[in-house]
């Protein structure tokens, strides 16, 4: 596996222009990534450096976006530091004033995008909001829509009012080859604040229009060329001295690669210092302290400090209860859980399951989160040795079991932390015993591959062993049913790029197994 080496000092010496994706790189939701503000300010203070935030979000005006940036603490960034598809598209319309100035554009998009295109692009937009045709229930098909306005272009973007009449109008306008077909970006989904809720993006609207018309659009967002051309015109950047920081392979990294820039992902940023102490850091915090993208530097740190930026510890508790004793076992375990909650509330039971399919049938698996890290692990050891209530409850569980084991694990930084899920799911616990020395290679491959396994919100957690059998990885996936699991896995294989993840990880595996789990009444993961 070939990974280029680069340090912070080399970045500053060899690169003049720094491009950043926004959500997931500089901030997550409404929380700045640790070290991001300091890194941006450091670059802005150097007059020889150019800094740009490249977002694919066209739902906000520039003024609204700047207010968000300032609120997050990035107040040193100015209007000229932010580039969005809406800005690039407006510039395109303005640059072709002989065709578009004062002319109509049919817009499948938001009122904010309309304001940007009209104010900065010099066009007149129509089509936003709910479609004006109210009732299509009197027949099987719509045979006629209002085509009285003749636009010079059709623009597709995110539109919460997207509808069949809009597809029909756009498709009919585009029958005229002189009408240009313009798209802000082709992101099929947007990140959102509610786990499990899929938010269709601009790519969903344009895909429908493209399918009907057979026309290929001109796309203005990452990874397409118009945004790179706009950047060249605005800043006269040298691609060979430009670095693109992003978290999405299909937009950010592809954009950098396609335009001759250095591409960097958060998983690549590692601390070079041998003596630095483990801290809860973001990838930019590590970059500020000195980064490396060279496997030789990984030997200077423990695997856990490279693979996880969380202080949380997790514990897999596996109990093989006696056949026919499941109800009695779960009652005893419930009392044990209550004792633990009372004696140390920061040790939290996240998941609790019994095995429906797998190597061992009469088995329960519980996932505990130690919110204070090793402090909670020490507390658990002490409680099991000295507290009479814990010892009694633990003994009652043990009497119903033939075999028990406890493993300490940490979560990979590129996975989410396990979050509470509503009913009803089946869970697939996959364990992989890796060849010694291959954990970094595994993480590097999966940091890219995980993007292919998130569209159905199936990713629950990914962990690597700290105590117990080492070089073992655990992945937990959630599905609405076994048939849903089958459909989701088939859909993953249809995605270009997933096969590369499999090809890169299978040679690293010594042994693997899958268990299908169903939640108990104690589980937050239902």
UniProtKB/Swiss-Prot annotation:
It comes from Caenorhabditis elegans. This is Putative NipSnap protein K02D10.1. Belongs to the NipSnap family. Pfam families: Hydrolase_6 (PF13344), Hydrolase_like (PF13242), NIPSNAP (PF07978). Gene3D superfamilies: 3.30.70.100, HAD superfamily/HAD-like. One of its GO terms (molecular function) is phosphatase activity. It comes from the Eukaryota. NCBIfam families: HAD-SF-IIA, PGP_euk. GO terms for biological process: mitophagy. PANTHER family: NIPSNAP-RELATED, PROTEIN NIPSNAP. Disulfide bonds: none annotated. GO terms for cellular component: mitochondrion.
């Amino acid at each position: 596996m070939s990974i280029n080496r680069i340090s912070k000092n080399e970045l500053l010496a060899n690169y003049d222009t720094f491009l950043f994706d926004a959500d997931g790189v500089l901030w997550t939701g409404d929380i700045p990534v640790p070290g991001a503000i300091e890194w941006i300010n450091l670059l802005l203070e150097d007059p020889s450096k150019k800094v740009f935030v490249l977002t694919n979000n066209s739902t906000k005006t520039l003024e609204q976006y700047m207010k968000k940036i300032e609120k997050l603490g990035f107040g040193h960034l100015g209007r000229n530091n932010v580039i969005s598809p809406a800005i690039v598209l407006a510039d395109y319309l303005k640059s072709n004033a002989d065709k578009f100035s004062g002319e109509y554009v049919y817009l499948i998009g938001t009122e904010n995008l309309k304001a940007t295109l009209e104010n900065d692009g010099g066009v007149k937009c129509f089509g936003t909001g709910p479609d004006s045709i109210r009732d299509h229930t009197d027949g099987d098909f719509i045979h006629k829509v209002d085509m009285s306005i003749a636009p010079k272009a059709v623009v597709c973007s995110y539109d919460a009012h997207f509808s069949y009449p809009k597809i029909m109008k756009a498709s009919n306008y585009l029958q005229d080859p002189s009408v240009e077909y313009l798209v802000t970006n082709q992101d099929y989904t947007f990140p959102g604040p509610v786990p499990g809720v899929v938010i269709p993006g601009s790519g969903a609207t344009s895909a429908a229009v493209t399918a009907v018309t057979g026309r290929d659009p001109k796309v203005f967002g990452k990874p397409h060329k118009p945004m790179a051309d706009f950047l060249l015109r605005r800043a006269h950047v040298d691609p060979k001295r430009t670095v693109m920081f992003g978290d999405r392979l299909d937009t950010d990294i592809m954009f950098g690669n396609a335009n001759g820039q250095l591409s960097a992902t958060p998983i690549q940023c590692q601390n070079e210092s041998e003596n630095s102490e483990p801290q809860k850091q973001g990838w930019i915090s590590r970059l500020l302290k000195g980064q490396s993208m060279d496997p030789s530097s990984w030997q200077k740190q423990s695997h856990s400090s490279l693979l996880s930026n969380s202080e949380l510890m997790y514990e897999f508790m596996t109990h093989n209860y006696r056949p026919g004793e499941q109800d009695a076992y779960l009652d005893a375990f419930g009392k044990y859980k209550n004792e633990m909650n009372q004696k140390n509330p920061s040790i939290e039971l996240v998941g609790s399951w019994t095995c429906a399919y797998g190597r061992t049938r009469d088995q329960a698996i519980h996932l505990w989160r130690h919110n204070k890290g090793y402090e909670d692990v020490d507390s658990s050891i002490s409680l099991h040795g000295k507290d009479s209530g814990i010892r009694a409850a633990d003994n009652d569980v043990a009497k119903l079991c033939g075999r028990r084991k406890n493993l300490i694990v940490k979560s990979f930084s590129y996975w989410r932390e396990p979050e509470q899920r509503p009913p009803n799911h089946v869970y697939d616990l996959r364990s992989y015993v890796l060849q010694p020395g291959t954990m970094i290679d595994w993480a590097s491959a999966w940091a890219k591959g995980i993007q292919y396994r998130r569209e159905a919100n199936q990713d629950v957690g990914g962990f690597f062993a700290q105590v117990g059998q080492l070089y073992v990885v655990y992945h937990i996936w959630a599905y609405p049913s076994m048939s849903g699991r089958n459909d989701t896995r088939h859909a993953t294989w249809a995605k270009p790029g997933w096969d590369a993840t499999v090809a890169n990880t299978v040679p690293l595996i010594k042994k693997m197994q899958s268990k299908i789990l169903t939640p108990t009444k104690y589980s937050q993961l239902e």
